[in-house]
Amino acid sequence: MSTVNEIIEKLKTLTLLEASELVSQIEETFGVDASAPVGGGVMMAAMPAAGGADAAPKEEEKTLFDVVLEEIPADKKVGIYKVVRNIANIAVNQVKEFTGTLPKALKESVSKEEAEAAKQQLEDAGAKVKIV
């Protein structure tokens, strides 16, 4: 099996969260933007609309966010576990299992305000968190 086919097969096994992280790392590593249009459509998209020469096309604003717990420092586990338990509304014995493999989405499809609040609580406890 060729290297390309092996990579494709491995990509098929990724979760959405892992795929999102992969895209982010590819963008950072190679200095590209995965949301940028490719091909002949670039010329058309770059032309201003007839009604307003200065009007730029507005990007659709994201309304739902995921709070991703990326890292828990060993010396701050207890405090972070308490916050994770409260945010995820899970039992004490489930917290360690939940945080066993990171990064992991702690909250999914929540408002920006809720995501920011959860991120702040986790960061205050010492966790490394990002909102996607």
Curated annotation (Swiss-Prot):
Gene3D superfamilies: 3.30.1390.10, Single helix bin. This is Large ribosomal subunit protein bL12c. The gene is rpl12. Signal peptide: none annotated. Belongs to the bacterial ribosomal protein bL12 family. One of its GO terms (biological process) is translation. Forms part of the ribosomal stalk which helps the ribosome interact with GTP-bound translation factors. Is thus essential for accurate translation. Coiled coil: none annotated. It comes from Tetradesmus obliquus (Green alga).
